[in-house]
């Protein structure tokens, strides 16, 4: 039986480890290069997300907890961008910036939802040692409920055992996502969360779940751990406490699109649940459900409480249309969506007398990301742009009809002649406009592009316009 969803609101989690910036280039692949037998990708979109230890913290924040990251970075543009992304998601940062070092960056090229290649940018962190990490960590532990060590063997955790000892002295449980074959580095931790390949690299091949549990319990005893949670892909997970009965949790995934970052979601959900007072068995069951949700998403992603509640069967799946919002409500919703790794698409218009052309356009706009914001001119703004006889339909009715479309997430009004100020506040990943404009002519173009987003013009459905519709109505008396 899966436990009910706890409240994560006041749970504070510190995540120490290898901080990364994940970058994605998206595009179509239709031919092979004449220069070499490789596909040519025409890039038409790019996005950035926190990765590694930063993605663990992002997952905690997406669940509603308070998260802070601790670790080394370069003193470079990637570190600045990572800080901006974390700040936007409400995640605190304690970076140790090192001049001349690279912030760990992974660039993935994606076409048709398939990863074609990954390029890694990293050179290590010269001079960063245990004392430096401990100095970063100790102040953060003061008001934390749980410490997570996210180890990708990139140099952020030169002595994890020393950090574990410091956390245990402070009375904080320590969860570790381990790396490498020497788990003695993690002696005294509360819990390790290796995947099956990592686990078997330490203990040897295991024939079945029972053997996994047996060897995990022995390893827990040898290393003075409370338990191990071994993630096993399509076979689910095995929780093996040092004392007590092992539990095998079958997978909850319905579809698997991408396992990138799934381990981050598991340990983040465990940390948030344990910090909320859930026992280890129930916290592991929740983490298993969260993993089943996140592998159904593309790229490094997160899980929201609504998604977790729906997966638990305790509530409806999050609705695509979240209704009419004011600007503060929109910005709060966008922050939550970004914390969940969702791309924000934004468009705007009068949308007077909604017709098939509008519906077709909004459907195509929504396919550019996971969330669609529609900014709507208020009545006075429409009158200034279209003339005193417009709008035909008042603002409240126009917004209500738009919000009823399953392609639209949020509808927000604006009173200016252009939504430039609102666009700057939202900073969508992709700004979309219908018509025959040049992208540079679209309000908000410069700020969106400067923030790393893109601007796209979509052609409108021929023969469908509000002006023509009004003319036809008038011609029929």
Swiss-Prot record:
Specify the domain of life of the species encoding this protein: Bacteria
Enzyme type, top EC level? transferase
- What gene is behind this protein? hldE
Keywords of the record, alphabetical order, are: ATP-binding, Carbohydrate metabolism, Kinase, Multifunctional enzyme, Nucleotide-binding, Nucleotidyltransferase, Transferase
Provide the residue span(s) of the region labelled Cytidylyltransferase: 346-477
List GO BP terms, alphabetically: ADP-L-glycero-beta-D-manno-heptose biosynthetic process
Pathway of action? Nucleotide-sugar biosynthesis; ADP-L-glycero-beta-D-manno-heptose biosynthesis; ADP-L-glycero-beta-D-manno-heptose from D-glycero-beta-D-manno-heptose 7-phosphate: step 1/4; Nucleotide-sugar biosynthesis; ADP-L-glycero-beta-D-manno-heptose biosynthesis; ADP-L-glycero-beta-D-manno-heptose from D-glycero-beta-D-manno-heptose 7-phosphate: step 3/4
Q: What is this protein called?
A: Bifunctional protein HldE
Q: What species was this sequence derived from? A: Halorhodospira halophila (strain DSM 244 / SL1) (Ectothiorhodospira halophila (strain DSM 244 / SL1))
Q: By its UniProt entry, which Pfam families does this protein fall under?
A: CTP_transf_like (PF01467), PfkB (PF00294)
Q: Where is ATP bound in this sequence? A: 195-198
Q: Does the keyword Nucleotidyltransferase apply?
A: yes
Assembly and partners are described as:
Homodimer.
Q: Which one of the record's GO molecular function terms can you name?
A: heptose-1-phosphate adenylyltransferase activity
- What cellular component GO annotations does this protein have? cytosol
* Region annotation (Ribokinase) ranges: 1-319
Residues forming the catalytic site: 264
InterPro entries tied to this protein: Bifunc_HldE (IPR023030), Carboh/pur_kinase_PfkB_CS (IPR002173), Cyt_trans-like (IPR004821), PfkB_dom (IPR011611), RfaE_dom_I (IPR011913), RfaE_dom_II (IPR011914), Ribokinase-like (IPR029056), Rossmann-like_a/b/a_fold (IPR014729)
Q: Which family does it belong to?
A: In the N-terminal section; belongs to the carbohydrate kinase PfkB family.
EC numbers: 2.7.1.167, 2.7.7.70
Catalyses which reaction(s): D-glycero-beta-D-manno-heptose 7-phosphate + ATP = D-glycero-beta-D-manno-heptose 1,7-bisphosphate + ADP + H(+); D-glycero-beta-D-manno-heptose 1-phosphate + ATP + H(+) = ADP-D-glycero-beta-D-manno-heptose + diphosphate
SUPFAM superfamilies recorded:
Nucleotidylyl transferase, Ribokinase-like
Q: CDD domains this protein is in?
A: RfaE_like (cd01172)
What is this protein's function per UniProt? Answer: Catalyzes the ADP transfer from ATP to D-glycero-beta-D-manno-heptose 1-phosphate, yielding ADP-D-glycero-beta-D-manno-heptose.
């Amino acid at each position: 039986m899966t436990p009910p969803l706890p409240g994560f609101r006041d749970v504070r989690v510190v995540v120490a480890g290898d901080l990364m910036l994940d970058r994605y280039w998206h595009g179509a692949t239709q031919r092979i290069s004449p220069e070499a037998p490789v596909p040519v990708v025409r890039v038409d979109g790019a996005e950035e997300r926190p990765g590694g230890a930063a993605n663990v913290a992002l997952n905690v924040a997406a669940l509603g907890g308070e998260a802070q990251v601790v670790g080394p970075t370069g003193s470079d543009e990637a570190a600045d961008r990572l800080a901006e992304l974390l700040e936007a998601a409400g995640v605190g940062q304690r970076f140790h910036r090192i001049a001349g070092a690279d912030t760990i960056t992974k660039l993935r090229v994606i076409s048709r939802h398939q990863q074609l290649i990954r390029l890694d940018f990293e050179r290590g962190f010269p001079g960063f040692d245990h004392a430096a990490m401990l100095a970063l960590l100790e102040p953060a532990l003061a008001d934390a409920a749980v410490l997570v060590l996210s180890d990708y063997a990139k140099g952020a955790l030169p002595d994890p055992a020393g950090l574990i000892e410091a956390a245990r002295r402070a009375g904080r449980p320590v969860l570790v996502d381990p790396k490498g074959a020497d788990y003695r580095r993690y002696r005294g931790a509360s819990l390790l969360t290796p995947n099956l390949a990592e686990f078997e690299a330490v203990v040897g091949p295991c024939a079945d779940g029972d053997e996994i549990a047996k060897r995990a319990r022995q390893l827990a005893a040898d290393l003075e751990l409370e338990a191990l949670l071994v993630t096993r892909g399509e076979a689910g997970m095995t929780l093996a406490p040092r004392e007590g009965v092992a539990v095998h949790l079958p997978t909850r995934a319905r579809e698997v699109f991408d396992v990138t970052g799934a381990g981050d979601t598991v340990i983040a959900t465990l940390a948030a649940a344990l910090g909320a007072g859930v026992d280890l068995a129930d916290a592991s069951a929740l983490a298993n459900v969260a993993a089943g949700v996140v592998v159904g998403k593309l790229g490094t992603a997160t899980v929201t409480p609504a998604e977790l509640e729906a997966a638990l069967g305790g509530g409806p799946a999050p609705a695509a249309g979240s209704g009419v919002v004011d600007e503060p409500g929109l910005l709060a919703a966008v922050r939550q969506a970004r914390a969940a790794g969702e791309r924000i698409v934004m468009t705007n218009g009068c949308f007077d007398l909604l017709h098939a052309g509008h519906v077709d356009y909004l459907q195509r706009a929504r396919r550019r990301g996971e969330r669609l914001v529609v900014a709507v001119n208020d009545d006075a703004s429409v009158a200034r742009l279209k003339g005193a006889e417009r709008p035909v339909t008042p603002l409240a009715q126009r917004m209500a009809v738009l919000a009823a479309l399953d392609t639209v997430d949020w509808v927000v009004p604006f009173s200016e002649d252009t939504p430039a100020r609102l666009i700057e506040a939202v900073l969508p990943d992709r700004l979309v406009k219908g018509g025959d404009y040049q992208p540079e002519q679209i309000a908000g173009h410069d700020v969106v592009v400067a923030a790393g987003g893109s601007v796209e013009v979509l052609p409108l459905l021929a023969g469908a316009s509000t002006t023509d519709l009004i003319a036809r109505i008038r011609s029929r008396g």
